[in-house]
Regions:
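Residue-level recognition of pore/gate-forming positions within transmembrane alpha-helices
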Residues: 15, 37-38, 110, 186-190
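Membrane-embedded alpha-helical segments of multi-pass transporters/permeases
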Residues: 19, 23, 41-45, 114, ...
Length: 331
């Protein structure tokens, strides 16, 4: 009992240490997580050499799978961004007259958020919110809140986004299954946190017009955008491949050639790899974009994931330190 109390106390102190070093001392999260890992290891009686060895082996093991999928997802998101595919989805949903403007923004955020990091999605899609707000004389808040809620919900719970993919990998869950349930949860959370929340606020929500400095900000001309079919095919292809793998695991004999093929193409790395080259063709080459230009966009996209990969690696080391030092309370 005493050892369990010590473990829980150490864990709680390590969390406080992470928060304080990031918020008060302005440490980078990667450094804060490494510091917490060393702290937990020391409190659990691990030798310095064991702690260093665990960091060396653990970061590589964790990122071996995640780095490939996150990197490929970054390329896919970058192609969505530079080709205007995200705007295409928004324009198409705008034409669904039976949908209210806030629900449209939820669906735009939900679909585009599958391949876009949340901050990229906000920057990329906010001109669409500005455009709808001006055309319909709607408060910008009624459009921006549902959009940001949907983007954040997908970013948190749907692979191949880093946090959701990391948890899925650690738990040994099937990626296809997690995507299906994640999209369902993300949709419900977005509808509650967006349109329903706005209805509950009612007239208490202030009217926010489009800022004057952004009044002339426009969505790209429609004829320059990729087709809706090409856009949706690119976005949904990796999800479909992973779902096919999930269905095969549930319904097929595991010693057949077809099953092996479906397992291969449905692996998250393979599925994202295939989707990237489809995006290069449908969203790049067919949009008159040269390979040199796409290479430049790809390289620019990779710069945004360095922090994510380091933080994931360091965060997993803290978890592994707890397990390595018999700090798993469930034991």
């Amino acid at each position: 009992m005493g050892s369990q109390v010590w473990v829980v106390a150490t864990l709680l102190v390590s969390i406080v240490l992470i928060v304080l070093t990031i918020v008060k001392l302005k440490f980078h999260p990667f450094l804060a997580l490494l510091l917490a890992s060393f702290f937990v290891g020391a409190m659990m009686g691990m030798s310095p050499l064991d702690m260093v060895n665990a960091i060396e082996s653990g970061i590589g093991g964790t990122l071996g799978f995640l780095a490939a999928v996150i990197g490929l997802g970054t390329i896919l998101g970058k192609m969505m961004e530079v080709s205007g595919a995200a705007e295409r989805i928004g324009i198409a949903l705008q034409r669904c007259r039976w949908l209210s403007a806030d629900v449209i923004m939820v669906l735009v955020g939900l679909i585009c958020g599958i391949t876009l990091f949340v901050e990229v999605g906000v920057v990329l899609l906010i001109p669409l919110a500005f455009s709808i707000a001006k055309k319909t004389n709607t408060s910008l808040l009624k459009l921006a809140i549902p959009l940001c809620t949907a983007l954040m919900a997908v970013h948190c719970v749907v692979p191949p986004h880093p946090a959701a993919l990391f948890v899925t990998n650690k738990l040994g869950a099937d990626v296809g299954t997690v995507i299906v349930y994640g999209l369902m949860v993300g949709l419900m959370a977005s509808l509650v946190g967006g349109p329903l929340f706005l209805k509950l606020l009612g007239n208490r929500l202030p009217f926010k017009p489009v800022p004057a400095e952004f009044s002339d900000l426009k969505v790209r001309e429609e004829h320059t955008l990729p087709s809706l079919g090409a856009t949706l095919f690119t976005v949904l292809l990796p999800i479909a491949l992973m779902l096919v793998k999930t269905i095969a695991e549930l319904n097929m004999a595991k010693d057949g050639t077809l099953y092996t093929l479906l397992e291969f193409i449905g692996n998250p790395i393979t599925a994202m790899f295939i989707a990237v080259f489809v995006a290069y063709y449908l969203l790049g080459i067919r949009q008159h974009m040269g390979m040199g230009t796409m290479l430049t966009h790809t390289e620019h996209g990779f710069g945004s994931i360095a922090n994510i990969l380091l933080i994931i690696g360091a965060g997993d080391r803290k978890s592994t330190r707890l397990n390595s030092s018999h700090a798993n309370v469930s034991r």
